């Protein structure tokens, strides 16, 4: 029984399904606070985008010998490499039809968030012979993570609501919601 529970938890946590569900939950909080019906297509997009990006991140950061890593997560991911690749590919392909159901304004915001997320993960700077990404710059990692989560889980649902439901949310309320979520994630 313990073994099955452990394997299930390992799968949910290390495959990044849990973190993708957390992103959906954060967007659901936004809908709840605004007292509106959640957009299932946007929630699906958010789930698969989070799953793809987090898996992409770990696959890019593959250590030389992951099987001897001191971190159980790294050992699990690379001992289930094909599963991780499969989940990532399914996630990416799931984004295509969902993107067609989102507004142009939402897609522009998503393009910005995708750019930030990829730049965060890719080694775009070179110092000596070593390459670094934005995540390696002291102090910016927490800011970028909190910004990406608050924009994708608060601003994105609001932008989509304003584009499709023809409702207007006061700018002050939007800023307050985004700032509160930013601080929540950063805490």
Describe the residue ranges of each PLM region.
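Membrane-embedded alpha-helical segments that form the functional core of polytopic membrane enzymes
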Residues: 35-56, 111-116, 168-187
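Transmembrane helix-loop-helix
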Residues: 85-127
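Interhelical loop and helix-boundary elements at the membrane-water interface
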Residues: 2-19, 64-87, 120-147
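Glycine/small-residue-rich interface belts in oligomeric ring/scaffold proteins
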Residues: 43-75
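Core segments of transmembrane alpha-helices
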Residues: 21-25, 87-94, 144-155
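Short, hydrophobic transmembrane alpha-helix segments
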Residues: 28-41, 100-101
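Functional transmembrane core segments of multi-pass inner-membrane proteins
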Residues: 142-187
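Central hydrophobic cores of alpha-helical transmembrane segments in multi-pass inner-membrane proteins
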Residues: 24-28, 46-59, 92-94, 114-122
């Amino acid at each position: 029984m313990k073994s099955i529970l452990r394997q299930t938890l390992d799968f949910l946590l290390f495959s990044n399904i849990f973190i993708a569900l957390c992103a959906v939950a954060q967007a659901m909080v936004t809908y709840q606070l605004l007292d509106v019906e959640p957009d299932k297509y946007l929630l699906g997009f958010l789930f698969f985008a989070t799953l793809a990006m987090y898996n992409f991140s770990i696959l890019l950061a593959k250590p030389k010998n992951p099987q001897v890593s001191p971190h159980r997560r790294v050992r699990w991911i690379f001992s289930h490499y094909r599963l991780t690749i499969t989940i990532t590919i399914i996630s990416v392909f799931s984004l295509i039809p969902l993107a067609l159901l989102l507004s142009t304004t939402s897609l522009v915001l998503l393009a910005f968030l995708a750019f930030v997320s990829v730049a965060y993960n890719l080694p775009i700077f070179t110092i000596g012979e070593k390459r670094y990404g934005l995540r390696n710059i002291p102090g910016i990692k927490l800011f970028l993570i909190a910004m990406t989560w608050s924009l994708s889980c608060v601003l994105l649902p609001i932008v989509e609501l304003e584009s499709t439901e023809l409702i207007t949310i006061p700018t002050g309320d939007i800023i307050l919601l985004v700032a509160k979520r930013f601080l929540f994630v950063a805490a």
